[in-house]
Swiss-Prot record:
Residues 113-153 are annotated as: V1. Specific enzymatic cleavages in vivo yield mature proteins. Envelope glycoproteins are synthesized as an inactive precursor that is heavily N-glycosylated and processed likely by host cell furin in the Golgi to yield the mature SU and TM proteins. The cleavage site between SU and TM requires the minimal sequence [KR]-X-[KR]-R. It comes from Human immunodeficiency virus type 2 subtype A (isolate NIH-Z). The gene is env. InterPro entries: Gp120_core_sf (IPR036377), GP41-like (IPR000328), HIV1_Gp120 (IPR000777). Residues 566-582 are annotated as: Immunosuppression. This is Envelope glycoprotein gp160.
Length: 856
């Protein structure tokens, strides 16, 4: 029975120890390689030294880091803050450089206009099909088939700087750009179209639109992830070849429809970015085919300025020829082969639903008529002028359509009133500048909508913003989240921090993500180095950014880009201080591994330290962060309260604290309290005594009249000796006495104090005498329990000692037996080897003996 009780007790103790050991607590790790999607402003860097690049971008120094991550990450070219910022910023660049005329209506005056009824120059009604591949005539300004546009010559008078004088001006307009009172006759009164919605805010000087190359960079504390998978299509599948970078690649500022020009993503293959939910696509063309486009606006025209007031000008262009705004673009390269490869690539795409074996069912198609000009025609910008090109002949040429005109060039015209490509609205620009305009571009991509079915149509699109989905769609912006939670069996970190001599371990900021693909256990071993790398990388990037800002004094103008760059300087420090403030609120400031007393909330959710990365673990427990953070803050508040109470107790442990000046002030305060209490008690006692004497019929001592200063005569009994008079005899009917009341009163107070202290002593003695019998059984029971526990521990220690001795003897016996066995086996083996050796040595002797016997 006793043995079963011992076994039960041992089982309970072991179970308790197991439960205590298996209890999981929240552990805070600082410096883990994890991240989450972010949407903060990026800053740009460029090598262009034009006005916009100098003011609004930092100089590019080509000093950027990249590291490969062993992780799998999801990318989306459309739901992407990097591409959205690129679209917004390039739009601001376009508006800043081209400077549309807005505010203050420029030409809202009546104009006397003459309509020019024009026809096609060199147009023939023959049905013969002409295929033109030679562009020499286009370069020589003798293109046949280009029509003269319907123009309206207008004359109007306006006042300039001299307000009392009017001046006559001549301007040529497209018929669609003006509104006339009488549209049937050749002479009519006309007004500029959109007169009420277009106004001027600044000088409408002509500006060149020179494309610039720039890159985006992430602020310190953030990073850019890039997908290097060749099968990535802009939305899926998840990317397994991920690279972390501080900046993007260089990209070109593109503004066009239908085609993308001078892109940086062109490779020796054709690939397609396809939106995950609709038919929007961006097709990157193979640069092997050398696809180029050359545009030209010939002519030498005179441009006269109209000055409204100081600083405001509008340029007027007299009509000199019949095609003042005519231009054309011709295409060179292996276009037909490139378009055929596009069809073949589309047929192999996983999203394609048509017949994969028949590419002849895939056709290139122009958008329907009746849409905005930017949709109907290919719109591009050439040196600040907006060209609208009719691509019908070009599509006939690349598709080899029989029965229709096929030419490798397209007629274009320059417009002043254009639709904005990023926001809904219209902008008014100045008439074309004088002189010849030429621009050359490399065609690198196609913007299209794909309608798959029995007949698959690749319809060219006017979504100019799609160009940046291709340029930056393989990037994503992430925020480094170095703080992580995980359950461990350690409840509290109480050991002193040991400082070891370590070498400097700085990999730069991106080196912090170097262990992103490692298991949690392996990454946790380098948290100290990781946290130092994080801070060192932040400081390094801050210093680099500060240096380039100092070199760029134009940043003080605080333009849109300048504000972003200045904001990027403080983002990382704010992030680092925020992380440290959060760690401090949990009691984990400046610790890489911080054990807490907060229990882990979900026992079924535990990390796989050997196979799971920190990024995977953070994605699983991200929904618990708010609750864990609140619990850690509450635990830290309670810990601070406990530490405060403990420090109050510790102040009494050191004897020198008793002699401290502040302690003596406190002692004096306590003494004053005691004196005040005694005085108050004495007053109460005196009042009680006075009332008792009044009840006996005597007046109190202090009620004597002032005339009785020396003594009070009291009759007393003659037979009673004076030495036996006591306070109790006062009030007796016999005799009278003399009582010097001041001295007697002091004696009376002393007797009362002695009686009070004696009473308190008696009460305490009685209380202790009554408590002692009550506490004695409790102490005896506690002593018996401690004795039993001591005996039980001695018994278990004896059992453990006996077991250890038995195991030791068993090991000794095993070692002795093994030694003897090995020794015997060695001796037997040695004897066998000796016999074999003697036999081998005896072979010649046996042979000789055999030969002798044979000879005998």
């Amino acid at each position: 029975m006793k043995g079963s009780k011992n076994q039960l007790l041992i089982a309970i103790v072991l179970a308790s120890a197991y439960l205590i050991h298996c209890k999981q607590f929240v552990t805070v790790f600082y410096g883990i390689p994890a991240w989450r999607n972010a949407s903060i402003p990026l800053f740009c860097a460029t090598k262009n030294r034009d006005t916009w690049g100098t003011i609004q971008c930092l100089p590019d120094n080509d000093d950027y880091q990249e590291i490969t991550l062993n992780v799998t990450e999801a990318f989306d070219a459309w739901n992407n803050t990097v591409t959205e910022q690129a679209v917004e910023d390039v739009w601001n660049l376009f508006e800043t450089s081209i400077k549309p005329c807005v505010k203050l209506t420029p030409l809202c005056v009546a104009m006397n206009c003459t309509r020019n009824m024009t026809t096609w120059t060199g147009r023939t009604d023959t049905q013969n099909i002409t295929i033109i591949n030679d562009t020499s005539h286009a370069r020589a300004d003798n293109c046949t088939g280009l029509k003269e546009e319907e123009m309206i010559d207008c004359q109007f008078s306006m006042t300039g700087l001299e307000r009392d004088k009017r001046k006559q001006y001549t301007e040529a307009w497209y018929s669609k750009d003006v509104v006339c009172d009488n549209n049937t006759s050749s002479q009519s009164k006309c007004y500029m179209n959109h007169c009420n919605t277009s106004v001027i805010t600044e000088s409408c000087d002509k500006h060149y639109w020179d494309a610039m190359r720039f890159r985006y960079c992430a602020p310190p504390g953030f990073a850019l992830l890039r997908c290097n998978d060749t099968n990535y299509s802009g939305f899926a599948p998840n990317c397994s070849k991920v690279v972390a970078a501080t900046c993007t690649r260089m990209m070109e500022t593109q503004t066009s429809t239908w085609f993308g020009f001078n892109g940086t993503r062109a490779e020796n293959r054709t690939y397609i970015y396809w939106h995950g939910k609709d038919n929007r696509t961006i097709i990157s063309l193979n640069n092997f085919y050398n696809l180029t486009m050359h545009c030209k606006r010939p002519g030498n025209k005179t441009v006269l300025p109209i000055t409204f007031m100081s600083g405001f000008k509008f340029h007027s262009q007299p009509v000199i020829n019949k095609k003042p705004r005519q231009a054309w673009c011709w295409f060179e390269g292996q276009w037909k082969e490139a378009m055929q490869e596009v069809k073949e690539t589309l047929a192999k795409h996983p999203r394609y639903k048509g017949n994969r074996s028949r590419t002849e069912n895939i056709k290139f198609k122009a958008p329907g008529r009746g849409s905005d000009p930017e949709v109907t025609y290919m719109w591009t910008n050439c040196r600040g002028e907006s060209l609208y090109c009719n691509m019908t002949w070009f599509l006939n040429w690349v598709e080899n359509r029989t029965g229709q005109k096929q030419r490798n060039y397209a007629p274009c015209r320059i417009r002043q009133i254009i639709n904005t490509w990023h926001r809904v609205g219209k902008n008014l620009y100045l008439p074309p500048r004088e002189g010849e305009l030429t621009c050359n571009s490399t065609v690198t991509s196609i913007i299209a909508n794909i309608d798959a079915g029995d007949q698959t149509n690749i319809t060219f699109s006017a979504e100019a913003a799609e160009l940046y989905r291709l340029e930056l769609g393989d990037y994503k912006l992430v925020e480094i989240t170095p703080i992580g939670f995980a359950p461990t069996s350690v409840k509290r970190y109480s050991s002193a921090h040991q400082r070891h001599t370590r070498g400097v371990f700085v990999l730069g900021f991106l080196g912090f993500l170097a262990t992103a693909g490692s298991a949690m256990g392996a990454a946790s071993l380098t948290l100290s180095a990781q946290s130092r790398t994080l801070l060192a990388g932040i400081v390094q990037q801050q210093q680099q950014l500060l240096d380039v800002v100092k070199r760029q004094q134009e940043m003080l103008r605080l333009t849109v880009w300048g504000t972003k760059n200045l904001q990027a300087r403080v983002t990382a420090i704010e992030k680092y201080l925020k992380d440290q403030a959060q760690l401090n609120s949990w009691g984990c400031a400046f610790r890489q591994v911080c054990h807490t007393s907060v229990p882990w909330v979900n026992d079924t959710l535990t990390p796989d330290w050997n196979n799971m990365t920190w990024q995977e673990w953070e994605q699983k427990v991200r929904y618990l962060e708010a609750n864990i953070s609140q619990s850690l803050e509450q635990a830290q508040i309670q810990q601070e309260k406990n530490m405060y109470e403990l420090q109050k107790l510790n102040s009494w442990d050191v004897f020198t604290n008793w002699l401290d000046f502040t302690s003596w002030v406190r002692y004096i305060q306590y003494g004053v309290y005691v004196v005040v209490g005694i005085v108050a008690l004495r007053i109460v006692i005196y009042i009680v005594q006075m009332l008792s004497r009044l009840r006996k019929g005597y007046r109190p001592v202090f009620s004597s009249p002032p005339g009785y200063i020396q003594q009070i005569h009291i009759h007393k009994d003659q037979e009673q000796p004076a030495r036996e008079e006591t306070e109790e005899d006062v009030g007796s009917n016999g005799g009278d006495r003399s009582w010097p009341w001041p001295i007697a009163y002091i004696h009376f107070l002393i007797r009362l104090l002695i009686r009070l202290l004696t009473g308190l002593y008696n009460i305490c003695r009685d209380l202790l005498s009554r408590i002692s019998p009550i506490l004695q059984p409790i102490f005896q029971s506690l002593q018996r329990a401690l004795t039993a526990i001591r005996d039980w521990l001695r018994l278990k220690a004896a059992y453990l000692q006996y077991g250890c001795e038995w195991i030791q003897e068993a090991f000794q016996a095993l070692a002795r037996t093994t030694r003897e066995t090995l020794a015997g086996a060695g001796r037997d083996l040695w004897r066998a080897l000796q016999r074999i050796g003697r036999g081998i040595l005896a072979v010649p002797r046996r042979i000789r003996q055999g030969a002798e016997l044979a000879l005998l």
